[in-house]
Regions:
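Binding-site signature for planar aromatic cofactors or substrates
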Residues: 1-132
Length: 132
């Protein structure tokens, strides 16, 4: 599902996380992100307060959008997020945030997103199709 092309776009682009609860959508850009070797999307929690509230209310449902601004190649990943507050993923994000913000911000945890569907958002004939 997370092909090499999808992973390349994810690794080289900013992500927007979309969640919804009680009919109120929310979207937030994230910079502290990664793709695990098993294809899960990892997001460091620095400013995800509304996102976390929505995930708690909606059973963890989330969508991630990323695209290459030069080529317009893009994907939307839909899946389920789990929130963790310790372990190697959280430790890595804590170190990265500490380094960037010199203590002015901290990573409180991480989202581990299990993809269920990957949808092409690139303009053209494949737009809207699902990556298998």
């Amino acid at each position: 599902m997370i092909t090499e092309e999808v992973k390349s776009v994810l690794m080289n682009s900013m992500w927007d996380l979309a969640t919804c609860a009680n009919g109120e959508p929310n979207v937030v850009p994230v910079a502290f992100k990664d793709v695990s070797e098993d294809g899960k999307l990892l997001v460091g929690d620095v400013f995800l307060n509304v996102t976390l509230k929505n995930l708690n209310a909606n059973g963890g449902r989330i969508a991630v959008s990323a695209y290459d601004a030069q080529t317009l190649t893009g994907y939307q990943v839909k899946g389920v997020a789990e929130y963790v507050t310790d372990g190697p993923v959280v430790a890595a994000f804590k170190a990265a945030v500490e380094k960037m913000f010199n203590g002015a911000a901290i990573a409180k945890g991480a989202l581990i997103i299990t993809p269920e569907r990957v949808i092409v958002t690139t303009p053209g004939a494949q737009n809207g199709s699902e990556v298998k």
